[in-house]
Amino acid sequence: MQYEEENKYTRILGEEEERFDNAVRYRCEQKVINRIDGVVASHSETQRELILTPNHNGNKYWFKVDAGESFAKISPENMLAALELVDKIDVIKSQAEVSVDPDEGFINRVLNLEGIREKWEKCKSKMYRKINPAADGGMDEFRQLDKFTDVVDAHFCDEPTFRKELTGKLFFDVFFDRYLVGAALEDCKFERTFHSFLFDQTPIEATVTQAVSTDKETGLKKLSRYISFDDQRLIRYVRHHVMNIYRDRYQPFIKYNFTQYNFEFYHDTLLSEDGLPQDIKVNIIEEVRNNIEILVTYQIRRLK
């Protein structure tokens, strides 16, 4: 039944595809600063263009996302190859055709998982072809690549797993929202899942404060969201999980014991008259107090 349902959605998407003539181009820019004991340890920047094509028929909404140009840079430079590889895989994952919930606007199905998986398999084959097992250290490199690709392969095992992976990424997390389906926006508080940058995308439940206003400079509707959180609210399992990752990954070189986990999240969206975002700005501060800190700034700008 699952495959019949997927084929049904794919056929519908194909029938509607010829009506996708209203593509909107966005430029996404992300900056990440890592500090250890107050000292900057790394600084990275990624830039990417995404082309979004919306379509709806009655209460069914589809969105097609295509990737344009992508750039990455990082300091120290010896981390560039790893960043470029992650960026390349993110570009593959981002080329998604999705349906969204007609009431809430979040992604409820990825319609082209097979096509995305095929792109990943081609990318993976190219990576293996670059390794010569007979060369000095070639077998070690081969084994390391096996471990890496096994992790990535797991993201594509089925549609729910890939959808969870996709919606954990900032663009798909903050872009797909109630305004895409014309839902009413109002001042309120609600629960949402925050995916940790420091701790392997560990899901953490938090309360979001939302305010709706009019932007003074542009006159556009403005949606503002804010989270301030400390580890007093972490449930025991999540706190234990976070502490274990800290102990295994960070403490060997930081030395200091785990103190207190905090994060702050700021998210402003300007909505154009057609209901699509004109500009989205996200700021995230996440830390283990006094020991390690990550600062993320992310902007999505609609291009002319």
Residue ranges and their predicted role:
Residues 1-273, 277-304:
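Signature of exported/secreted
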